[in-house]
């Protein structure tokens, strides 16, 4: 299965233009190439779906732009699976971006990180309800030897058992999903 990451595609494009990656390339060029990469990834996803091929994509999930592709996969009888990894505050997300940037990854302005953090978590139920299977991990622990904590999992858009309490916004969004077995049964 092919795995697509717009950030990786952008970095490859920068290297092809003679840069070492994000650390020595102009921000304006990075933005231009990121939009090209995002369009390329969209085309690759669309092509894979049209051919009924398995494909994965990395996304912040801060918009619902992939909903139409997910719906197309389902309409074709395919499976959409979601692995959602989150940290417990937008401030921690900002700290992680600073670390990524120091390790030659790309930077993101703090205001965009804050905005995307909230939008991403709010989009979770919408995508989870369409998933054949989904897993939600809290990656807030900063100790590298500690893996992310699985706080929720589901099948066919339904939580399998109650989620492990994490942080308020995530707990609230997960509460929007049905839980199996239902206490109403």
Locate predicted features.
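Conserved substrate/cofactor phosphate-moiety recognition/catalytic segment
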Residues: 1-53
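Anionic group-transfer/hydrolysis microenvironments
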Residues: 7-9, 60, 140
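Short, hinge-like loop/turn segments at secondary-structure boundaries
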Residues: 20-23, 74-75, 98-102
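Glycine-rich phosphate-binding loop used to anchor ATP phosphates in small-molecule kinases
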Residues: 32-84, 120, 135
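A glycine- and Lys/Arg-enriched "phosphate-lid" helix/loop adjacent to the NTP-binding pocket
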Residues: 78-124
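NTP-dependent small-molecule kinase module
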Residues: 128-185
């Amino acid at each position: 299965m092919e795995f697509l990451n717009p950030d990786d595609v952008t970095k490859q494009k920068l290297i092809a233009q003679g840069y070492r990656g994000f650390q020595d390339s102009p921000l304006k060029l990075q933005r231009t190439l990121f939009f090209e990469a995002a369009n390329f990834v969209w085309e690759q996803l669309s092509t894979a779906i049209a051919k009924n091929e398995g494909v994965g994509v990395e996304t912040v999930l801060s918009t619902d732009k992939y909903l139409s592709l997910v719906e197309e996969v389902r309409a074709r009888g395919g499976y959409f699976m979601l692995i959602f990894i989150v940290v417990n505050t937008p401030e921690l997300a900002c700290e992680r971006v600073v670390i990524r940037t120091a390790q030659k990854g790309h930077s993101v302005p703090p205001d965009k990180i804050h905005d995307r953090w909230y939008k991403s978590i709010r989009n979770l139920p919408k995508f989870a309800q369409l998933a054949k299977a989904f897993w939600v991990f809290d990656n807030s622990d900063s100790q590298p030897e500690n893996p992310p904590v699985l706080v929720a999992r589901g099948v066919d858009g339904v939580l399998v058992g109650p989620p492990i309490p994490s942080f308020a916004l995530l707990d609230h969004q997960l509460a929007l999903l049905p839980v199996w077995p239902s206490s109403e049964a």
